[in-house]
A protein has these predicted regions:
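Alpha/propeptide regions of enzymes that mature by internal proteolysis
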Residues: 2-312
Length: 312
């Protein structure tokens, strides 16, 4: 990838740790992560604790308990976690009946020689590690699924598919991150999105920075999207410019062009951060010890997504 020089459109923090996450609900994720870190816990502990907040929020239809089920009415969850300094990673895919897949992903990273466990194997591992079975399907989601199931033409859910992705940077320039989702509503059973795929939904290079991709997971996976953003930062772009460059590169190849559902957050090890999405409306949250805010991302192309919407 050729080196490119552009004006720095990103924002730089002078206060650490820095937490950047997807969507407005990421602010609560960030706040818990900061609280955990300030209690003397590690950056990885902070990432896990922050994401667990979103996984436990039954009002969120796209992550953890209360997530939209698959076509069979079963909630299947995906998650990954990554530790920048050691370049370690753990992930789980299509796991059922476990409330906190982010914590199971961390156990995969720390207790096994593997990177990913999926389906029944992931659930068995979680139970062996002491995680408890949990009913993930709320009554509200069950009724919605029943109504959908009655339709003669069954289409995938068109809204509320929002991954929580959290990137974290400390004063030493070390980076950790994670993401978690229930994925595309009414997906085919066994479908795995980008969230547990390293280089798709999340990528960290501790010498450069980190990026998270959200949107339709198939788009993120087909282009190794988060990896592409980090590589643009390696070439010299600031985080926001790297996000924009990745979108333009993908749009130049994909038949949908700038009608593609894809959104990025990114930060570099110097404390610069930014975000961009196809169309207006993609929000991201930024938290430091001095402030916690929600921003609108840079919009590439026309169109718009609703706040916390248009994302699978």
């Amino acid at each position: 990838m050729a080196t490119a020089k552009t004006k720095n459109h990103s924002i730089q923090t002078n206060s650490y740790p820095l937490f950047v996450s997807t969507w407005a609900f990421g602010k609560a994720t960030n706040n818990k992560a900061l609280e955990t870190y300030q209690q003397g816990k590690s950056l990885l502990d902070a990432v896990e604790a922050g994401i667990r907040v979103t996984e436990a929020d039954v009002s969120n239809a796209s992550v953890g308990i209360g997530g939209i089920p698959n076509a069979d009415g079963i909630v299947q969850l995906d998650a990954c976690i990554m530790d920048g300094p050691d370049h370690r990673v753990g992930s789980v895919a299509a796991i059922e009946g476990i409330a906190h897949p982010i914590s199971v992903a961390r156990k995969v990273m720390e207790e096994t020689p593997h990177v990913m466990l999926a389906g029944e194997g992931a659930q068995k591992f979680a139970l062996d590690q002491g995680f408890q079975r949990t009913n993930l399907l709320t009554q509200t989601r069950q009724e919605e699924w029943k109504n959908w199931h009655k339709k003669s033409r069954k289409e995938a859910h068109s809204d509320a598919h929002d991954t929580i992705t959290l990137l974290a940077l400390d004063k030493n320039g070390d980076i950790s991150g994670g993401c978690s989702t229930s994925g595309w509503g009414y997906k085919l059973p066994g479908r795995v999105g980008d969230s547990p795929i390293i280089g798709g939904g999340l990528y960290i290079d501790n010498q450069v920075g980190a990026a998270g991709c959200t949107g339709k997971g198939e788009n993120c996976m087909r282009y190794c999207s988060s990896f592409v953003v980090v590589e643009f930062m390696r070439s010299g772009l600031d985080p926001q410019s790297a996000c924009i460059a990745a979108i333009n590169r993908i749009a130049s190849t994909d038949p949908l062009g700038l009608n593609l559902e894809i959104y990025f957050i990114a930060l570099d090890k110097r404390g610069n951060y930014g975000a961009a999405g196809v169309g207006k409306g993609f929000q991201y949250a930024v938290t430091t010890p001095v402030n916690s805010q929600v921003f609108q991302s840079e919009a590439v192309g026309g169109g718009s997504v609703g706040p916390e919407g248009g994302n699978r």
